[in-house]
């Protein structure tokens, strides 16, 4: 069963730039507009069988929301959101529907995993898609230098095995880059500066969450302690 805490935010990748650290070394960073996210549902072991929190992000025209989704948002008392994500965390009981989350849930030096949809490359050959070496430049090879070569035997096995790497559409898949470090947090503008590159194009949706292969963060402050701080989002 779940035994650790997670923190996460949905955001938009704005692009890459470079900054200087305390030792005047250039650091390449990706700028992510993190949040604001709003809690749209809290799941507990008693009601749902597991502990999780559902976050909403992005504005959407209420007229484009179907009735089931409209009722879901009305139950939480929040305006409709374009994107939803569920984050399993042991401290889900400390959240409350309508609570607003910003980049302040992370701090500089935090190690995170960033998930997004990679850039689509279109139809690609095996050398670009899978890193094949290709065929030789000589020894009778003619106009087949970027070919995959043999894909199977003749009479035995007499077929092509499932999963054989071939040419095809490359990219535009859900991808996670693990173990990235947050260089800085701009709370005034809601920016996260993440060292290195993250998946997806500029303007793409990304999920920033606590690194799965690092020690778990401390539990978030209980929702009762946040009352009166202006974190309630009305419908």
Curated annotation (Swiss-Prot):
GO terms for biological process: translation. Pfam families: Ribosomal_L3. InterPro entries: Ribosomal_uL3, Ribosomal_uL3_bac/org-type, Ribosomal_uL3_CS, Transl_B-barrel_sf. Coiled coil: none annotated. One of its GO terms (cellular component) is cytosolic large ribosomal subunit. Keywords: Ribonucleoprotein, Ribosomal protein, RNA-binding, rRNA-binding. One of its GO terms (molecular function) is structural constituent of ribosome. It comes from the Bacteria. The keyword Transcription does not apply. Part of the 50S ribosomal subunit. Forms a cluster with proteins L14 and L19. Belongs to the universal ribosomal protein uL3 family. One of the primary rRNA binding proteins, it binds directly near the 3'-end of the 23S rRNA, where it nucleates assembly of the 50S subunit. This is Large ribosomal subunit protein uL3.
């Amino acid at each position: 069963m779940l035994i650790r805490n997670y923190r996460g935010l949905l955001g938009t990748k704005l692009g890459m730039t470079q900054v200087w650290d305390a030792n005047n070394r250039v650091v390449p960073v990706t700028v992510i507009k993190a949040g604001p996210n709003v809690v749209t549902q809290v799941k507990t072991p008693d009601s749902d069988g597991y502990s999780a929190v559902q976050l909403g992000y992005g504005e959407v025209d209420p007229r484009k929301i179907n009735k089931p989704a409209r009722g879901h948002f009305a139950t939480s008392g929040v305006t409709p959101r374009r994107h939803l994500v569920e984050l399993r965390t042991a401290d889900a009981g400390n959240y409350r529907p309508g609570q607003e989350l910003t980049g302040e849930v992370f701090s500089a030096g935090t190690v995170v995993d960033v998930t997004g949809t990679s850039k689509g490359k279109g139809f690609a050959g095996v050398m670009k898609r899978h890193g094949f070496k290709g065929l030789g430049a000589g020894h009778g090879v003619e106009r087949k230098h970027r070919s995959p070569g043999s894909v199977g035997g003749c009479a035995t096995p007499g077929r092509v095995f499932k999963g054989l790497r071939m040419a095809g559409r490359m990219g535009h898949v859900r991808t996670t880059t693990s173990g990235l470090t947050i260089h800085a947090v701009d709370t005034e503008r809601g920016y996260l500066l993440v060292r290195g590159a993250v998946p997806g194009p500029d303007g793409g949706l990304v999920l920033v969450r606590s690194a799965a292969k690092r020690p778990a963060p401390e539990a978030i402050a209980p929702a009762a302690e946040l009352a009166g701080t202006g974190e309630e989002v009305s419908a």
